[in-house]
């Protein structure tokens, strides 16, 4: 016959095993989803900015654009130049290029900053050399873009050193280099 102490131990063991079996493991996808929600929440707390706006938020926007390699001044005034740069950023990140900075554009800027730290240009060049060889020179505008599948890539022109030494342009072609290491030639 089972003692009271044994029954309590079996109940505790069963409960612990059930909790472990049915707990949701933390995966990279779950962590990324949680992180994305934090970025979106932060983005929603900032104001919508458009041409004619002027504030410290505009200054922050301009600095963020500059940090991710979009050429704009940082003066706190949302003028035509800032609007055009915002449209470039939106186009590069598969957003509607309306020149208005709302939650989606703020979130894309925040995400771009994080992705640039995780996937620097130097890593992309390493992937490119591995694929195309060490005799290739890569040039880029350092902008991290998004493709139709929301995958981040840098756009490079690849040039052959020997061809340049012989007086030619050396251009082999334009390539998209992804965080995964994929090197895809750009089609026209």
Question: Each PLM stretch: what is its role?
Answer:
Residues 2-6, 17, 24-73, 114-122, ...:
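Acidic, Ser/Thr/Pro/Gly-enriched interdomain connector segments
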Residues 11-21:
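Bacterial N-terminal signal peptides
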Residues 50-60, 66-110:
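Short acidic, glycine/serine/threonine-rich helix-capping segments at coil-helix boundaries
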Residues 91, 157-161, 187-188:
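Secondary-structure transition/turn motif
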Residues 100, 155, 184-186:
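Structural recognition of the beta-strand scaffold that forms the well-ordered cores
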Residues 117-144:
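N-terminal export/targeting and maturation segments
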Residues 139-177:
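Exposed beta-strand-loop-beta-strand "reactive/processing" segments of non-cytosolic proteins
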Residues 176-188:
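Short, low-complexity, Pro/Ser/Thr/Gly-rich segments in the mature regions of secreted, periplasmic
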